[in-house]
Amino acid sequence: MGEAAVPPELDTFPAAKMAQTNPLPVPMGPWKITVYDQENFQGKRMEFTSACPNIMECGFDNIRSLKVECGAWVGYEHTGFCGQQFILERGEYPRWDAWSGSNAYHIERLMSFRPVCSANHKESKITVYEKDNFIGRQWEISDDYPSLQAMGWANNEVGSMKIPCGAWVCYQYPGYRGYQYVLEADHHGGDYKHWREWGSHAQTSQIQSIRRIQQ
């Protein structure tokens, strides 16, 4: 195939081009991310304005640094938007620990990524429920909380969640640490009835801090 040629040092993938391999609806919005195959923004680089399900298809073996210029993104440990999630908001990430440094787990791989299309910091709401299927005690949240327990949530687990608007990142531990779960109003219809729907890496219903995603 003609696309097998080595890409130039800087290539731009507009939404129309990436749509060939993107299983998600092509977003139409102000998203832009530049990824590098070496730390500190060195080596091969590529610019994207839409989702990339497999960076290896672009000639990379891994992403080792990146710059988010527009919008919010979520990166994944594995191809196909699987594995641990890493929220990527506007700014520079010179090496892997810049996006997973608050994570309790040593993960240096970032193999796929996509825009967080519903991020809206000012108009975000989420309701957390004590049990699966939106049962039990509930609490509507519209602000950032580094510790749910300190604000009165009874335990360190959340059974299910509803997101009518915006996008959130939930963390396993207080202080925005541990596994990250990016939850959005435009995924699952905003209804996450069980912790297994939070991501392929979810192994527990433990959630102890939560914040709105910055667009």
Curated annotation (Swiss-Prot):
Pfam families reported in the protein's UniProt record: Crystall
InterPro entries membership: Beta/Gamma-Crystallin, Beta/gamma_crystallin, G_crystallin-like
An MF annotation (GO) of this entry: structural constituent of eye lens
One of the GO BP terms on file: lens development in camera-type eye
Keyword Nucleotide-binding among record annotations: no
Stated role: Crystallins are the dominant structural components of the vertebrate eye lens.
Oligomer and partners: Homo/heterodimer, or complexes of higher-order. The structure of beta-crystallin oligomers seems to be stabilized through interactions between the N-terminal arms.
Name by which UniProt lists this protein: Beta-crystallin A3
Organism: Gallus gallus (Chicken)
Organism lineage: Eukaryota, Metazoa, Chordata, Craniata, Vertebrata
